[in-house]
Amino acid sequence: MKVVVIDSGTGNLASARRGLEIAAGRAGLDAKVIASADPLDVRNADRIVLPGQGAFADCARGIAAIEGMRGAIEEGVAAGKPFLGICVGMQLMAERGLEHEGAPGFGWIKGEIAPISCPGLRLPQMGWNGLDFTSTGCVHPLLNGLQADDHAYFVHGYALRDGDQAQILATTEYGGPVVAMVASGNRAGTQFHVEKSQEVGLRILQNFMVWTPEGTSGS
């Protein structure tokens, strides 16, 4: 199995790669995990991971600046390859981001990325926070082995707004419910830094490594 962590210049590549390697080992998989900015590697991948940090528009520009990368991602997803977006990588799955000048997203999940509304609370949200699973999340294979109120590590000031409840797997509480995890078909994303979320994050990554979304043949 070949897993590609996309290097768009804005992600935490080393931690994501290491987490995936540990997860593959726990799952008993013979997996090669690489970080790459080469669209050909993405086309040849069995699983695709897109980490991202910073502003939505900057991450979108990072993808656009690599000739052929957006097309390679779309081709992989259309072919049924499992995709995982991390932090801003998840946000890019939405229709649009409103940070700074605003920018279009991939349009894979409904909603836009907007500032968190939490009067009296510090922004960005930074630290450990509990996960609340939705009815969709409770039966989703990416959350197998996890329990309600398991904690994950967040660093963000923007979040998905006006999303489709059927695409939301988990929320967290920060001045109100904030979307923490989404999925649509073979595309999934975590607003939290799954690669920094210790055992909870490793469990999700392990689930991702063995995930066979409905309608795909697996890898």
From Swiss-Prot:
Protein name (Swiss-Prot/TrEMBL): Imidazole glycerol phosphate synthase subunit HisH
Keyword match Hydrolase: yes
Pfam families xref list: GATase (PF00117)
Cysteine pairings via disulfide bonds: none
EC number(s) from the headed UniProt entry: 4.3.2.10, 3.5.1.2
Places the protein is found: Cytoplasm
Active site: C87, H193, E195
Listed NCBIfam families: IMP_synth_hisH
Function description: IGPS catalyzes the conversion of PRFAR and glutamine to IGP, AICAR and glutamate. The HisH subunit catalyzes the hydrolysis of glutamine to glutamate and ammonia as part of the synthesis of IGP and AICAR. The resulting ammonia molecule is channeled to the active site of HisF.
UniProt gene name: hisH
Functional pathway: Amino-acid biosynthesis; L-histidine biosynthesis; L-histidine from 5-phospho-alpha-D-ribose 1-diphosphate: step 5/9
